[in-house]
Amino acid sequence: MAQRIFTLILLLCSTSVFAGLFDAPGRSQFVPADQAFAFDFQQNQHDLNLTWQIKDGYYLYRKQIRITPEHAKIADVQLPQGVWHEDEFYGKSEIYRDRLTLPVTINQASAGATLTVTYQGCADAGFCYPPETKTVPLSEVVANNEASQPVSVPQQEQPTAQLPFSALWALLIGIGIAFTPCVLPMYPLISGIVLGGKQRLSTARALLLTFIYVQGMALTYTALGLVVAAAGLQFQAALQHPYVLIGLAIVFTLLAMSMFGLFTLQLPSSLQTRLTLMSNRQQGGSPGGVFIMGAIAGLICSPCTTAPLSAILLYIAQSGNMWLGGGTLYLYALGMGLPLMLITVFGNRLLPKSGPWMEQVKTAFGFVILALPVFLLERVIGDIWGLRLWSALGVAFFGWAFITSLQAKRGWMRVVQIILLAAALVSVRPLQDWAFGETHTAQTQTHLNFTQIKTVDELNQALVEAKGKPVMLDLYADWCVACKEFEKYTFSDPQVQKALADTVLLQANVTANDAQDVALLKHLNVLGLPTILFFDGQGQEHPQARVTGFMDAETFSAHLRDRQP
């Protein structure tokens, strides 16, 4: 008896194992979106928590989460920082795994108010779901002063500003600005004014007065940084809008052009004259007078300092961080003041000779400012085009530096020239791949010629017009990475094209995910993309031939031979 039971158990186990061996390779092993991303919510007066329980092997896109109130007012929602995910077609994206809890503060909600929540995710196996939309009913909430505060994300999840350089770079920029033609020649004169024309001061006294002057200048810059950062904090959400980012990028580009000498950017001459007169009334050689002179000097912007200062101020406004804003401008002023302190203590013998090299320093800072619009535009146009902009900037800078270095006659400059030329050649690679690589691929690959359909009626009409031929329907969307992999790697393969030579090819682009797209996906019982369906000559689908998820050319060719009706 025991032997029979044991034999029966083995038979049942072997049946399930062998059944798995004969499962169709294209059959869906993916769960519905509601199971992949289990959504829930809980409201307690002004506090609303949105929760996603994300199944293992699946993830949500951070940038695809949208929250829209109806008959309600909510505080600005700050999405927690996710983890980075990278693919060939969309580059780096922030995603959420496992679990996501999003607190929302409801300032006011009328009777019948709702919250529309839209989100989208994919599976690691190469399967993406259309955008999901959930409607959250809200309990009536009366506005009060406490609820008007912005929602706070737990501290460990607070997103930090992603900065292209740290505040310490401001110190180096300040030192570099000191060697521009508008600043460096003025240092001996400023040194004499600070010391009050006294030539027999002790080194310690001279250093103290110069340090006080620099601190006065730094105070002005720090105050500017705090004010701009505070203003940026109030308008942080607006400053992240694509149109605002594009506008700021244009402003940064214009500031860079002023460093290239296309036009002069400075305070009005009348205002500069008034500030200069105020500074001249102060008594040089005294700590109080020197401090006021430094504070006023911070407001007098020369053509060489206006553009970099404006660029840093606009950049600080983007961060919205007051500590960063004040610290960055303080270090910038300190960097400008260090050469002045050295000249005051050690004399003009440390001062390099004036010459064309100062104009080259000014031009170099123009390229530094140009890095900021690239950083901003990268958020709008994506990482792929952002890399191309960085490539173009690198080619321009290293190319300019190489041409400039050709004027030098010293032997060791040959090594520098080789390094600059090599850097330019390395920088041009992304542009070369874009200009020649993709074009070459497009010329050598012949893609399938699909007939586009949009609605269920158009699909039915196309099946009738097939006149007995087998039909393949490809469901495609721009947000589907695996769909693009099908186009690039599978549909371009000659063996696949040969196998589909006698097949009517249809394609439905459901990128918009509008009502017609949703109706088509529902009619076909499709969970997500990529999904490829096969119909026989009578317009009946062969469910066993359906493909979900990516297949390479070899696997897809074998699937066509085995499954296509």
Curated annotation (Swiss-Prot):
Transmembrane segments: 163-183, 208-228, 243-263, 289-309, 323-343, 357-377, 384-404
Compartment list: Cell inner membrane
Protein name in the entry: Thiol:disulfide interchange protein DsbD
Catalytic activity: [protein]-dithiol + NAD(+) = [protein]-disulfide + NADH + H(+); [protein]-dithiol + NADP(+) = [protein]-disulfide + NADPH + H(+)
NCBIfam families per record: PRK00293.1
Gene Ontology terms: cellular component: plasma membrane
Membrane topology: Multi-pass membrane protein
MF (Gene Ontology): electron transfer activity; protein-disulfide reductase [NAD(P)H] activity
The protein's enzyme class: oxidoreductase
Gene3D superfamilies: Glutaredoxin (3.40.30.10), Thiol:disulfide interchange protein DsbD, N-terminal domain (2.60.40.1250)
Keywords: Cell inner membrane, Cell membrane, Cytochrome c-type biogenesis, Disulfide bond, Electron transport, Membrane, NAD, Oxidoreductase, Redox-active center, Signal, Transmembrane, Transmembrane helix, Transport
Family: Belongs to the thioredoxin family. DsbD subfamily.
Limits of the Thioredoxin domain: 434-565
Signal peptide (UniProt feature, chain positions): 1-19
Primary location recorded for the protein, binned into one broad class: membrane
Its job: Required to facilitate the formation of correct disulfide bonds in some periplasmic proteins and for the assembly of the periplasmic c-type cytochromes. Acts by transferring electrons from cytoplasmic thioredoxin to the periplasm. This transfer involves a cascade of disulfide bond formation and reduction steps.
Record-annotated disulphide pairs: 122-128, 182-304, 480-483
UniProt cross-references to InterPro entries, sorted A to Z: Cyt_c_assmbl_TM_dom, DsbD_gamma, DsbDN, DsbDN_sf, Thiol_diS_interchange_DbsD, Thioredoxin-like_fold, Thioredoxin-like_sf, Thioredoxin_CS
EC number: 1.8.1.8
Organism lineage: Bacteria, Pseudomonadati, Pseudomonadota, Gammaproteobacteria, Enterobacterales
